[in-house]
């Protein structure tokens, strides 16, 4: 009888494990341009992010110990480190440029361990601001590893954005993991550069405007994935009631199979 009970227990455990594997990993992904904290405090950002309980957050316009005249309340703040501390998440930072006595760049927060990360500089013509990508391998609870990429593309010229998109596609083409790409692309959906991304990447967001928060007129913030067949989109939303920045946060909840 004991052997029968043990066999049944093992059987149910196996079925449960198979079911969990079939369901995949449910992830809540966020992309948020912080506008270097000019319009809100670091504590307000931390409180908002914590309230959403995201699994991974891509952050753009992140200062590191700068001294800006436009944001004196943020002087000396190491944004990504402090957001990671106050939200209880892992955090990594990628410097794009030296600025105002510190650094300016992009960051990533993750509920799960970040196994590896790198900052990679994007093409630049020497006339525009240096941009970068932050590439992180993240281990999910079941042991699966995904690669999450955060970026903030050139704002002034479409030519540079096109070169940057081409670079990103080429740089990531041999990645063996499920890929996610999020950030402020500084381009609306129907531009050539966004069409180039959609040739290989699936857009996990809707077309609700993300900028400017005081008078929304355009969508420039996105979350993408590839290969598309491995990811199921459950819901996506632009948080139009959150006005801590000039951008709205973009959130997509997905299942990664």
PLM features: residue spans?
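Positively charged n-region of N-terminal signal peptides that target proteins for export
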Residues: 1-4
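Bacterial N-terminal signal peptides
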Residues: 7-16
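Active-site regions of metal-assisted phosphoester/phosphodiester hydrolases
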Residues: 9, 20-56, 90-93, 97-257
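Acidic/histidine-rich, surface-exposed loop or edge segments in extracytoplasmic proteins
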Residues: 31, 58-67
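Short, flexible/disordered intra-domain loops and linkers
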Residues: 66-77
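Charged, glycine-enriched surface loops/patches
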Residues: 79-89, 109
């Amino acid at each position: 009888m004991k052997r029968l009970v043990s066999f049944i227990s093992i059987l149910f455990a196996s079925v449960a494990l198979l079911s969990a594997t079939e369901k995949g990993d449910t992830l809540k992904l966020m992309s948020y341009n912080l506008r270097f904290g000019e319009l809100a405090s670091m504590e307000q950002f931390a409180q908002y992010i914590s309230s959403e309980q995201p699994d991974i957050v891509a952050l753009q316009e992140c200062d590191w110990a700068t001294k800006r005249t436009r944001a004196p309340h943020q002087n000396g703040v190491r944004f990504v480190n402090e957001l990671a501390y106050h939200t209880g998440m892992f955090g990594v930072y990628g410097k794009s440029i030296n600025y105002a006595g510190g650094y300016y760049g992009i960051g990533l927060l993750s509920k799960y361990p970040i196994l590896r990360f790198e900052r990679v500089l994007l093409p630049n013509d020497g006339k525009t601001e240096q941009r970068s990508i932050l590439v992180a391998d993240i281990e999910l609870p079941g042991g699966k590893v995904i690669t999450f990429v955060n970026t903030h593309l050139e704002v002034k010229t479409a030519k540079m954005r096109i070169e940057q998109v081409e670079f990103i596609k080429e740089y990531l083409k041999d990645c063996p993991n499920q890929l996610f790409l999020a950030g402020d692309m500084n381009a609306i959906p129907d531009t050539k550069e966004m069409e180039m991304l959609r040739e290989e990447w699936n857009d996990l967001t809707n077309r609700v405007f993300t900028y400017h928060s005081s008078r929304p007129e355009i969508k420039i913030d996105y979350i993408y994935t590839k290969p598309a067949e491995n990811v199921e989109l459950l819901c996506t939303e632009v948080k139009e009631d959150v006005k801590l920045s000039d951008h709205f946060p973009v959130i997509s909840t997905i299942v990664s199979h």
